[in-house]
């Protein structure tokens, strides 16, 4: 299960070459993974020509990926700086957590009423992966599985709008954690994830909602005031621990337009 990439997303580009399409998908996936796993900091600058060179794609393809990332709130365009990894402000961070406090307690309440045994087992597998990552000191992997836990709850609720919303909120939460110097050791607590699933398993909707609210509050409380971020041109950070795979290994059975 450790080979599963919860951040791999399928996208389509107007490009005749399957190899080029696969490289574009790979570029998007690795940029998102690098942000989520805290490998790349808010303020990091993306230069079109550098990305094109790293991933062996055209600058047109790079622009499409950057435009999508901008729509998702993961990058921003700044005067004289160009495109950089977004750094949520204090108010934006507050908004992110307010939205999550409205959505996630409702999600776990719904799961208390209707959640299959398979979903419960899937949740526990994710928690196990997260715990093993913590024990091995693999901080980046622990962060990844922590985010996947929250997205998997939304997925189990079978509400497509919430699945999309939670995907965006968890990604933006990762940026907020970085921008606010939150420690990954005290943000998403593995034990709290287990307690939430136990409440769902026992169909205790009030306890599940209460535990989720407390969990989100603990994450927010782990943050300090936003710090000024410095931009960098070191895009090789994107590939730290994420070696470029062969484009032929990228799944392309179903694509989405940028």
Identify the residue ranges that each predicted region occupies:
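Mobile beta-alpha loop/short-helix "lid" or hinge segments that flank ligand
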Residues: 73-76, 169-171, 185-187
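C-terminal all-alpha effector/ligand-binding and dimerization domain
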Residues: 2, 124-127, 131, 136, ...
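Charge-dense, low-complexity intrinsically disordered segments
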Residues: 14, 18-22, 87, 94, ...
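Conserved amphipathic alpha-helical segments that form helical-bundle/coiled-coil interaction surfaces
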Residues: 92, 96, 100, 108, ...
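Short secondary-structure boundary/hinge segments and terminal tails
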Residues: 52-53, 87, 171, 184, ...
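Alpha-helix boundary recognition
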Residues: 36, 70, 167-170, 201
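Short linear motifs at protein or domain termini
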Residues: 1-113, 224-258
